[in-house]
């Protein structure tokens, strides 16, 4: 394996931060006062990212709720995905005894809040205003410990999603069947089938057939938790169809097999092309991001320690022994495009770089228009930038 890392060509003018962070200025409904949340759930702990005061940037961020029984792994998921905690270190985390609010915005393209709920939360407690919390929530993630008896968890799942659906039917409901690293493949499939069947039967009995649950097998000891969170976050991105379309156009004109648009900090992929996601390919791309950041921390910082491990000049090429090439390029301050292609296709690097320049410009236009209009933009937004894409070296305007 060979690694090439260094500065790329002159960056696109204004690229560093031009597209900035996704829903920073999008309207997701006004969030209630933080004091209300504290009164509703016995206090809200300040997250590592720090919370903004009422009326600040918090009011435009989608909210993701992490719920589940005690010791199901909720806090571990949050720490591993968004705070780079080693999975082994999560063994020393204390149980959550109050609502813990984590603001994911200062160092990530993915701009939202995660509320980690204690396992003993009682919805029938008159002092708990669950309606206030469920209003304005983008997604509810319910974590079930697959290695434990999950009958009580299924009962709590049904109560939780039923109440949430009545308050906010537009919310996405996600179920993480967690800690599956200790189960055999057959046991994983059987556990997922059983939980899926029982949960949906309970909803059908309650007349909630329209309530859709999405199920994921997850573990903090592999990349499954990152992939699951990627799919959860993608549902909250109004520009997702546009991003997928841009990626499809880019790879079809550049001879690329697979491309991911990554949030560098969390390793969540914001979008990918329409071809199926192979877990091994995703893991390769995640590992490449780790390598690039680690190498950059060693050689990319200034003598006084200033600078950034990832900036507008970041670019890396890794050539594997099986003639596969991994190619990483900076898109925005927090986004990177990671491509998988064959060595013979990479011989046309000039073509790929030109098409990437057009792709990056289109991405910036998508989010600039989105911030201005407070709504997801259509495909017309980026049409002008993609007209210049070349196919087999021939400019579009020359065809």
Curated annotation (Swiss-Prot):
Residues that bear Phosphothreonine: 96
Binding residues annotated for GDP, in chain numbering: 71-76, 90, 94, 96, 178-179, 181, 219-220
Activity regulation info: The activation of RagC/RRAGC is mediated by a GTPase activating protein (GAP). In high-amino acid conditions, activated by GTPase activating protein FLCN that stimulates RRAGC GTPase activity to turn it into its active GDP-bound form. In response to amino acid depletion, the GATOR1 complex inactivates RagC/RRAGC by securing the GTP-bound inactive form.
Gene Ontology molecular function terms on file: enzyme-substrate adaptor activity; GDP binding; GTP binding; GTPase activity; GTPase binding; magnesium ion binding; molecular adaptor activity; protein heterodimerization activity
Keyword Metal-binding included in the entry's annotation: no
Effect of mutating residue 120 to L: Maintains GTP-bound state, leading to inactivate mTORC1. Decreased RPTOR-binding
Annotated EC: 3.6.5.-
Result for mutant: residue 75 to Y: In LNGODS; renders cells partially insensitive to amino acid deprivation and result in activated mTORC1 signaling; results in altered regulation of TOR signaling; increased interaction with TFEB
UniProt keyword annotations, A-Z: Acetylation, Cardiomyopathy, Cytoplasm, Disease variant, GTP-binding, Hydrolase, Lysosome, Membrane, Nucleotide-binding, Nucleus, Phosphoprotein
Gene Ontology cellular component list: cytoplasm; cytosol; FNIP-folliculin RagC/D GAP; Gtr1-Gtr2 GTPase complex; intracellular membrane-bounded organelle; lysosomal membrane; lysosome; nucleoplasm
Gene3D superfamilies: 3.30.450.190, P-loop containing nucleotide triphosphate hydrolases
Residue(s) carrying N-acetylserine: 2
Documented effect of changing residue 75 to N: Found in patients with follicular lymphoma; maintains the GDP-bound state leading to constitutive activation of mTORC1
Annotated phenotype, changing residue 74 to R: Found in patients with follicular lymphoma; increased activation of mTORC1
Matching Pfam families: Gtr1_RagA
Compartments where located: Cytoplasm; Nucleus; Lysosome membrane
Record flagged with keyword Oxidoreductase: no
InterPro entries for this protein: Gtr1_RagA, P-loop_NTPase, RagC/D
Modified residues (Phosphoserine): 2, 15
Result after altering residue 75 to F: Found in patients with follicular lymphoma; maintains the GDP-bound state leading to constitutive activation of mTORC1
Annotated stretches, region: Disordered: 1-20
Disease involvement: Long-Olsen-Distelmaier syndrome: An autosomal dominant syndrome characterized by lethal dilated cardiomyopathy, bilateral cataracts, mild facial dysmorphisms, and liver dysfunction. Some patients have brain abnormalities, including pachygyria, polymicrogyria, and septo-optic dysplasia. Death occurs in infancy. RRAGC mutations have been found in a patient with idiopathic dilated cardiomyopathy with ventricular dilation and systolic dysfunction, bilateral cataracts, and mild facial dysmorphisms.
Entry function: Guanine nucleotide-binding protein that plays a crucial role in the cellular response to amino acid availability through regulation of the mTORC1 signaling cascade. Forms heterodimeric Rag complexes with RagA/RRAGA or RagB/RRAGB and cycles between an inactive GTP-bound and an active GDP-bound form: RagC/RRAGC is in its active form when GDP-bound RagC/RRAGC forms a complex with GTP-bound RagA/RRAGA (or RagB/RRAGB) and in an inactive form when GTP-bound RagC/RRAGC heterodimerizes with GDP-bound RagA/RRAGA (or RagB/RRAGB).
Family label: Belongs to the GTR/RAG GTP-binding protein family.
Assembly notes: Forms a heterodimer with RRAGA, in a sequence-independent manner, and RRAGB. Heterodimerization stabilizes proteins of the heterodimer. The GDP-bound form of RRAGC (in complex with the GTP-bound form of RRAGA or RRAGB), interacts with RPTOR, thereby promoting recruitment of mTORC1 to the lysosomes. Component of the lysosomal folliculin complex (LFC), composed of FLCN, FNIP1 (or FNIP2), RagA/RRAGA or RagB/RRAGB GDP-bound, RagC/RRAGC or RagD/RRAGD GTP-bound, and Ragulator. Interacts with NOL8.
Protein name: Ras-related GTP-binding protein C
Top-level taxonomy: Eukaryota, Metazoa, Chordata, Craniata, Vertebrata
Record gene name: RRAGC
